[in-house]
Amino acid sequence: VSANVAPIEGEFDYIIVGAGSAGCVLANRLSANPANRVLLLEAGGNDNWIWFHIPVGYLFAIGNPRADWLLKTEAEPGLNGRSLNYPRGKVVGGSSAINGMIYMLGQAADYDNWRQLGLPGWSWEDVRPYFRKHVDHFLKSEHHGAGGEWRVEYPRLSWEILDAFRQAANEYGIPTVDDFNTGDNEGICYFHVNQKRGRRWSAARGFLKPVMHRQNLQLATGCLVEGLELTVRRVTGVRWRQNGEQRAARSRGEVILAAGSIGSPHILMLSGIGPSAQLSKFSIPVALDRPGVGSNLHDHLQLRMIYKVSGVKTLNETYASVFNRVGMGLNYAFRRRGPMTMAPSQLGAFTRSDSTQDRANIQYHVQPLSLDKFGEPLHPFPAFTASVTNIRPTSRGALALKSADPAMAPAISPNYLATPEDQQVAADSIRVTRSIVRQPA
């Protein structure tokens, strides 16, 4: 990892830990006021590798220490003791540099529920203006803005096999829609993607790079945060290791943790903020006993089903030909089109796992390809994959310290399929998949 080790002098108004999807936006917005001095810390390096910008580059980034934290879950009881890879971006841009590029807002009811739980200012109508402000969307409608930093485009290719699945979903009762981001995402359509003219449009490219000329904004890369500095239960600074040296910075305003659902609680616990029993186990002085730190982890498990097909093209047999692969490369190089612009999933759908659900509770990711697992070769036969996930699981996981060493990842336990409700939705969602593919289309 290359590191930006420019001198860090004086105090900052804001120190942001993590230059990922949230950190890049925060750095942009906070440094817009020239009176604010902002420091942005990132554990990874700069996004100057070509595969961070070619859409299919996630194939080379996930599982690569140049781009990925290489996290794994603990053995999952609900998955017969299997441990899963848990990709998280370790680069300027964070996971937006290696993810599926799908632009997806939540359901209006989800945001309204936050307000009902006691979060004023977080209802659907409250957050919509901010979504509109930051986006530059190809759809010109009341739901989307134009001219913002976050570019959203329609995918640059379609597949007959995916169109057939969409028709089958229509016959099952799932309507075709134009946009998942209107507040009610029930329906089926091609996913809209964070790309600009055929290139991945990460948070770094959209929000950070255009403002790096600001004299009041400083980015430091290769910074493994070791903990927060506290003064009488107030966070006043950050300490980190960079190029083998310990460094620190102080904040006269705020320290903002934007290190993600794993990194942020991990840093809190390393700093003595968390469950006292865990902290004491690793001889970390307890600054604030907070049992909730590291608990209540929500995650979505995808259930994949693969179907062999005939008489229709899929990526499996297309990619098998060397001639075709050369053509894909040339098509992308000269036209920014073709399979190299593909997101991991192209066609999406939201529907209900059974008739008792009051709104869509499962989501589909449909791909014109198949393989045994990520990173392995495509199958030698034509096939497509339909993955389905419960978007409101009731199972709750947790993470726990394994060591006081900041370089050692915490124990991650998503606790998939731990509740009868999630087990029922999983079974019902597979039945829905089978019902769709049995349609005449």
Question: Where are these predicted regions, by residue range?
Answer:
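Non-transmembrane alpha-helical segments in soluble domains
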Residues: A27-S31, Y111-R115, R128-R132, D163-N170, ...
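Aromatic-residue-lined binding/catalytic grooves and analogous aromatic/hydrophobic interfacial grooves
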Residues: C24, G198, T356
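Acidic-histidine catalytic/liganding microenvironments
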Residues: N33, H213-Q215, Q439-P440
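N-terminal glycine-rich phosphate/pyrophosphate-binding loop and immediately adjacent elements
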Residues: S2-R132, D289-G292, H300-V309
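Conserved redox-cofactor binding core of oxidoreductases
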Residues: R115-V235, R304-M328
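Glycine-rich loop(s) and the adjacent beta-strand/alpha-helix scaffold that form part
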Residues: N33, R37, G44-W49, L228-R233, ...
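FAD-dependent oxidoreductase catalytic-site/capping-region signature
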Residues: V1-F12, R128, H134-T182, C189-F191, ...
